[in-house]
Design a protein with these regions (language model features):
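Active-site loop segments of alpha/beta catalytic cores
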Residues: 5, 27-189
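A contiguous, low-structure linker/loop signature
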Residues: 1-24
């Protein structure tokens, strides 16, 4: 129920216009409030036994997840990123606002210890470190910064899903309590 952001799931995601249609939700939208309520219940059950973390995808990853996991279209995210970078940046900013709201509520209203924050390079040669930082990184960092203000226990996960390699240097300024990456995919242990 929570894996898809509503304005991403209800969107054809075919062009820049579709990316511009992605808008933030009201703070009392069920996509936010129901996650908080669910995590309140879960952390009540387990937080006295183990540390509790919640998987949070970085802003534009919600778009990639929709396209790859739901549509099974493994090329369209890169197509959109290459052909509509400013529109993707807009979508990331809008999604980032909701993710910040969600993270703030989760880390202040539940017994979560931190978030497990998932990032991944845009798998395109057009997205060098400078472009990534400008189009994607600013909004990723805003979420992580907020999480770090609320908890010292956040985990940065550099996702190697489907054996997509990442330039780990892109994340050298991403401060977290712990780091996780795909050891075999990245070839770094």
């Amino acid at each position: 129920a929570f894996i898809g952001h509503p304005t991403v799931m209800e969107n054809p995601l075919r062009n820049g216009e579709d990316l511009l249609a992605i808008k933030r939700l009201p703070e009392d939208h069920p996509w936010i409030t129901e996650q908080v309520e669910h995590l309140k219940k879960m952390t009540e059950l387990f937080s006295d036994k183990v540390m509790c973390f919640y998987n949070i995808f970085s802003p534009v990853q919600w778009i990639r997840i929709r396209l790859e996991f739901f549509d099974l279209d493994f090329e369209r995210f890169v197509y959109l990123a290459e052909n509509y970078p400013k529109e993707l940046q807009h979508a990331g900013k809008e999604l980032g606002k909701d993710i910040q709201t969600l993270v703030r509520k989760l880390l202040t209203e539940t017994k979560l210890d931190g978030i497990y924050y998932c990032v991944q390079n845009v798998q395109s040669p057009k997205y060098d470190q400078k472009t990534y930082k400008e189009i994607v990184g600013e909004d990723e960092l805003a979420v992580l910064k907020l999480a770090n203000e609320l908890s010292p226990y956040n985990i940065l996960h550099i996702c190697g899903y489907a054996h997509h390699k990442n330039n780990l240097d892109f994340y050298k300024d991403y401060e977290a309590g712990a780091y996780n990456w795909a050891v075999h995919t990245e070839g770094v242990s």
